Amino acid sequence: MIIKQAEFIISAAWKKQFPIDGKDEIAFVGRSNVGKSSLINAITNRRKLVKVSGTPGKTRLVNFFMINNDFYFVDLPGYGYAKVSKKELEKWSQTIEGYLVGREQLKKVILLVDSRHKPTKDDITMYNWIKYYDYKCIVIATKSDKIKRSEKVKNEKLIKETLKFNDSDEFYFFSSATKQGRDELINNICSGINYSENSL
């Protein structure tokens, strides 16, 4: 799988604004500042496809990006940032869950967690939502360049135990800084997605 083209399509505030062309979708979700924008930029090899915000919790819309004119990457709002009102937190929750409900085009959800830390309560809730709505899930532990190789086994065990990880799902470490394992990650993220010869 080769990503030759990545194009921003729309920032959607409402479900009626979501694309209706029926193309497959892969969604990316994680708490604020987990490195979601950096990861999407890294795997598409576009430095500025997704704007990396210095302000946690700034992304509040559902952003759609067309990949190779075949399918979408969907960037969901970051969750879990403390310095917002309860009303705003509820709005983000509604936005994320509103996207997940009955989205037939959605083929898998990529949940990003910080490789350095135990998953938060919000991470656990998000993972449970993904499983409740019966989507295929890939958990990516970001910022892996920040931990020692010897810590990876311990941290992977902690993350999986905290999430009550389902063995049918997949787990990867990734660093947007080094991009090590990028090609393998792309192939696994995009497996099972409908795409044309343009993506081969």
Swiss-Prot record:
GO terms for molecular function: GTP binding; metal ion binding. The keyword Magnesium applies. Belongs to the TRAFAC class TrmE-Era-EngA-EngB-Septin-like GTPase superfamily. EngB GTPase family. One of its GO terms (cellular component) is cytosol. PANTHER family: ENGB-TYPE G DOMAIN-CONTAINING PROTEIN (PTHR11649:SF13), MSS1/TRME-RELATED GTP-BINDING PROTEIN (PTHR11649). Pfam families: MMR_HSR1 (PF01926). It comes from the Bacteria. Residues 22-195 form the EngB-type G domain. One of its GO terms (biological process) is division septum assembly. SUPFAM superfamilies: P-loop containing nucleoside triphosphate hydrolases. InterPro entries: G_ENGB_dom (IPR030393), GTP-bd (IPR006073), GTP-bd_ribosome_bio_YsxC (IPR019987), P-loop_NTPase (IPR027417). Its cofactor is Mg(2+). The gene is engB. The keyword Cell cycle applies. Keywords: Cell cycle, Cell division, GTP-binding, Magnesium, Metal-binding, Nucleotide-binding, Septation. This is Probable GTP-binding protein EngB. GTP binds at residues 30-37, 57-61, 75-78, 142-145, 174-176. Mg(2+) binds at S37, T59. Necessary for normal cell division and for the maintenance of normal septation.
